[in-house]
Design a protein with these regions (language model features):
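A short, N-terminal "cap"/entry segment at the start of jelly-roll beta-barrel domains
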Residues: 1-43, 54-56, 88, 128-143
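Conserved short histidine dyad/triad with adjacent acidic residue
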Residues: 45-63
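Glycine- and acidic-residue-biased ligand/ion/polar-headgroup-sensing regions
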Residues: 62-79
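A short hydrophobic beta-strand segment most commonly corresponding to one strand
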Residues: 66, 110-130
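Short acidic-glycine-tyrosine-enriched beta hairpin
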Residues: 80-101
Length: 143
């Protein structure tokens, strides 16, 4: 038995479930847990940022992301590549969708945890253009 999805290969209904541990990666601002990395389909992360730290001011050429704050308070900056950025204070439950080429940065006011769901186009792991980075990674796709 198979289930068909438009634009996708058939998925077998009798495919076994897979149990595994999320991949943990230390970052200069905290750490992330990648709990789903289905290349060509989607990525799911839980990201922990310690108070006072910021992720890079960045954008993606192809990848799109949705970020939802689970706990804490954060400032989210976002806007066009060639325009002014908007800053918005986020609390638990606040969510933002970021299409490709939207500049964005998350700054933790308190310790924060947020969920990130994104597309996974070919090369998604390197699809980051860092405009500013407090940890010396500007202009790189280093983790």
């Amino acid at each position: 038995m198979t289930a068909e999805s438009p634009g996708r290969a058939p998925v077998r209904a009798d495919t076994p479930a897979v149990v595994y541990r999320a991949q943990e990666q230390d970052k200069p601002w905290g750490h992330e847990q990648i709990f789903a990395a289905m290349d060509g389909r989607y990525v799911g992360k839980v990201i922990h940022v310690t108070a006072g730290n910021s992720l890079s001011l960045q954008y993606h050429e192809h990848k799109e992301e949705t970020i939802s704050l689970i706990s804490g308070e954060a400032d989210i900056q976002y806007g066009p590549v060639d325009g002014d950025l908007t800053t918005r204070r986020f609390g638990p439950g606040d969510t933002i969708h970021l299409p490709p080429r939207v500049v964005h940065r998350v700054t933790a006011i308190t310790d924060i945890v947020f969920a990130e769901a994104s597309t996974a186009p070919p090369g998604w792991r390197e699809d980051v253009v860092r405009l500013e980075d407090a940890y010396g990674r500007t202009g790189t796709s280093a983790p």
